[in-house]
Amino acid sequence: MAKFNKKKLPSRHTSLGADRAPHRSFYYAMGETEKDVAKPFVGVVSTWNEAAPCNIALMRQAQSVKKGVRASGGTPREFCTITVTDGIAMGHEGMKSSLISREVIADSTELTVRGHCYDALVGIAGCDKSLPALMMAMVRLNVPSVFIYGGSILPGQYKGKDVTVVDVFEAVGKHSAGKMSAKELRKLELVACPSAGACGGQFTANTMACVSEAIGLALPYSAGTPAPYEERDKYALLSGKTVMNLLQKNIRPRDIVTKKSLENAATIVAATGGSTNAALHLPAIANEIGIKFDLMDVAKIFKKTPYLADLKPGGKYVAKDMWLAGGVPMLLKTLFDGGFIHGDCMTVTGKTMKQNLKNIKFNPKQKVLRAYDNPLSPDGGVVGLKGNLAPDGGIVKIAGLKKLQFTGKARCFDNEEAAMACVQKKKYKAGDVIIIRYEGPVGGPGMREMLSTTGAIYGQGMGEKVALITDGRFSGATRGFCVGHVGPEAALGGPLALLRNGDVIDIDAKKGTINVRLTKSQLATRHKKWKAKKSSFGSGTIWKYAQTVGPAYLGAPTHPGKRKEVKVYADI
């Protein structure tokens, strides 16, 4: 077992010397021995709660992490932080809390580690914003760290087919259109979510789980095993052991997360037809380490990456199927073979990506993952857009779309509720471009996801017949011609705020353009008449967020990151 010089670790501030006798008394009160207190302290943070199935299995896995830490010479210190689960927050004001929770999770993890002087960190997360949040905290603190996903939910079974919660969201649209009875809707909702774990398709949680392996912060294969399976405890135990190895070798998150590894992460998102939210989270992670990696940098990777994974919502299969087919490492291997992955990036194994992938072979007998030279489509499932309607950019998920160009007339709504009411009453028509504005990071505040609205549109059979544009976000589960992250946002006087009903909009996902048929002078004239809307929040966390949040194309950061860092926590 390795020996550690505690005099060189942050925890010396809470455990060494006569003046720290009161601190040590607290540890003895919790059952730790003098030997335990003399060892490195490892924070074990999870986002466990009972809000939804996504995080319900995390406390169990945390116990296995702690066993791994102790077995390798460390003293684990478990703590929980919050999470807001999008599936519950969706479709009402609660969704304003979702993206904000990313910052609170990262900040609270930072404060806990700083306040108690932990030497290393293992983070376990199971829902959309908690995954990037813990990765952000890791690179911000820069103590040796390992991320581990809590695992995906098992698919439900309805009429002999695999289903996920997204089928229920879309069934709401079918029900409102008279295409599904209340009895059938109830049958579906009762079977769609049969276990613990995050939503089962290639939605945001599973997208960011793939990112955790591709970026190098998680152990190979750890993203794939479903939450209910005992194999998750094996990876949790190994993660606890791994973080101690990283501490011994002084391999830190900023040695792992680099421009190249961020490009690897964007590549896995594109290859899996993953969530557009990754284009928000990767720039936010980059901000923590002072790297410029914005929405359009992500989009460049998306444009040149083949789409290889036939996963829901654009494809046929769920996360469990990808795991059985060969998991993230097999997909990374074929991408590496095709020259799409940087092999020289360090990972938490203490080896490079190339070394990790050395003995992995592609299995051609499965149907979920394609080889790099036999893609579902030659470019990624997500495309960046720019034009006079989105000078800072926007993003659209094209995985599963049959048509990549759309021209139509604007139907403008100043919040999601107004748009949803229109959709529920079916007061829109084929060819409309539904605009949902004032839902950006500042305007929302909180940049809500629009799954309830897009799910209802798709359920009504209109998913390919209309387009939707917003300065808000979309769930990773969204289907249809939906453009999000449009900036500058309406609340800041961006072009979305200047649109009127009937304005003609052209979207071309092949060329990567999004424009309204208005001249510069017409837009300028409208801008002179525009007046900012008063926020519906004058105090509290949501108000505070709106005062500090940056633009979506930079990841909606709430602090300057490493650019203005004076000293990093790990070196205190």
From Swiss-Prot:
Modified residues annotated as N6-carboxylysine in this record: K129
Keyword annotations of the record: 2Fe-2S, Amino-acid biosynthesis, Branched-chain amino acid biosynthesis, Iron, Iron-sulfur, Lyase, Magnesium, Metal-binding
Catalysis: reaction(s): (2R)-2,3-dihydroxy-3-methylbutanoate = 3-methyl-2-oxobutanoate + H2O; (2R,3R)-2,3-dihydroxy-3-methylpentanoate = (S)-3-methyl-2-oxopentanoate + H2O
Cofactor: [2Fe-2S] cluster; Mg(2+)
Cofactor: binding details: Binds 1 [2Fe-2S] cluster per subunit. This cluster acts as a Lewis acid cofactor.
Binding site for Mg(2+): D86, D128, K129, E449
Record-linked InterPro entries: DHAD_IlvD/Edd (IPR050165), Dihydro-acid_dehy_C (IPR042096), DihydroxyA_deHydtase (IPR004404), DiOHA_6PGluconate_deHydtase_CS (IPR020558), ILV_EDD_C (IPR056740), ILV_EDD_N (IPR000581), IlvD/EDD_N (IPR037237)
Keyword Iron assigned: yes
HAMAP family: IlvD
Protein name: Dihydroxy-acid dehydratase
Name of the encoding gene: ilvD
